[in-house]
């Protein structure tokens, strides 16, 4: 189906070949679990050499959802990014944490809050609580999902649907 290189976090990056069956099984489960349908508009952030894009591409092919390829330059200008999401009525984003943090770090929501977003998923890094909560305040009714999985297992092997606003733990809570 496709081959992609790992990040090399355990040494030298290696090429991984992901077969048709793995991709089909993963996308069947992913779209069913998160309710992706032909009414969704998926805003693609990930380049095609990053396995996060697999979820965007094949979820839209399986369900008939619209796939909007967001121009890379939009991620340098939150106003352009938020205009793009709003103009295209994007409902679903499956982004790297750093892409979500660009919006909050540069105070993008002071400019605009795209109205159609209802599924916000992220992976690839730890999501800082401050940024997660900033998104949650803007989208209290949206589904927020933290995804995790190595390239070798076809994208993701676990997820957590976030139901609460979080506060940073006190050092006393860690004892």
Where are the predicted features?
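Conserved AMP-binding/adenylation subdomain of ANL enzymes
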Residues: 14-43, 47, 51-91, 160-162
């Amino acid at each position: 189906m496709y081959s992609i290189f790992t990040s090399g976090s355990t040494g030298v990056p290696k090429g991984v070949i992901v077969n048709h069956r793995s991709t089909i099984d993963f996308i069947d489960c992913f779209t069913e679990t998160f309710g992706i349908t032909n009414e969704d508009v998926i805003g693609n952030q990930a380049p095609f050499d990053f396995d996060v894009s697999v979820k965007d591409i094949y979820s839209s092919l399986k369900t008939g959802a619209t796939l909007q390829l967001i121009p890379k330059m939009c991620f340098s200008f939150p106003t352009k990014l938020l205009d793009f999401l709003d103009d295209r009525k994007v409902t679903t984003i499956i982004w790297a944490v750093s892409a979500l943090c660009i919006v909050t770090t540069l105070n993008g929501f002071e400019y605009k809050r795209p109205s159609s977003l209802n599924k916000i998923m992220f992976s690839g890094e730890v999501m800082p609580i401050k940024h997660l909560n900033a998104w949650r305040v803007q989208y209290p009714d949206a589904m927020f999902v933290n995804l995790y999985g190595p390239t070798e297992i076809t994208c993701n092997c676990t997820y957590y649907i976030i139901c609460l606003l979080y506060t940073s733990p006190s050092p006393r809570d860690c004892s």
